[in-house]
Amino acid sequence: EKYYYNNVIGTVNLLRAMLAHGVKKIVFSSTCATYGEPQYTPIDEQHPQNPINPYGRTKLMIEQIFADYERAYGLQHIALRYFNAAGCSADGKIGESHTPETHLIPLVLKAISGERKDIKVFGTDYDTPDGTCIRDYIHVEDLALAHRLAVEKLGSYNGCINLGTGIGTSVKEIITAAEEVSGKKCPT
């Protein structure tokens, strides 16, 4: 329910307020979750969308609402479809902070540092080279830059842009990289 209320109803309320004040431009943080299970990789913007959870469905609904508002009210919009945001800025001012933590990289680092007992690897039978799930990670500073560039493009482009690297990294590869950087073994 929270995704429907926050994402869909919240966006409609925001759009109503924007139109009431003559604002017709928006950059939206969408998600690769609008695609659901990939039919092919790398995933491009024309990939069929079939979200498999409420989060992805509500983000897709918002993209569809933007298209309707473009036709009805001239809304200029860019939806940035994030893949997996990761990392932080060198000064630590921009980055991930989740309570409770659910993202792989921070969980691995917490296990290595001893802040948590271990890291559980769920799924070792994927059709991937090492059997673990593969994700496309994008650094938070790259996301920030993409937002700035999208704001500059508003008016000359309406639509969606994927934000990823196009390079997948497996769960085991993340664990190995963290071990190499830290010089410590990750308890699994």
Annotated model-derived regions:
Residues 107-188:
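C-terminal substrate-binding subdomain of Rossmann-fold SDR/epimerase-dehydratase oxidoreductases
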Residues 18, 70, 150-154:
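Hydrophobic pocket-lining residues that define ligand/cofactor binding sites across diverse proteins
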Residues 31-34, 87-90, 126, 152, ...:
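Active-site proximal helix/loop that lines the substrate pocket
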Residues 29, 56, 95, 123, ...:
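Glycine-centered small-residue hotspots that permit tight backbone geometry or close packing
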Residues 29, 38, 133:
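A conserved catalytic-core signature of glycosyltransferases
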Residues 26-28, 34, 78-81, 120, ...:
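Structural signature of the Rossmann-like NAD(P)-dependent dehydrogenase/reductase core
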Residues 11, 31, 58, 132, ...:
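Ser/Thr-centric signal marking residues that sit
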Residues 2-13, 20, 24-25, 34-79, ...:
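Catalytic helix-loop patch of NAD(P)-dependent Rossmann-fold dehydrogenases
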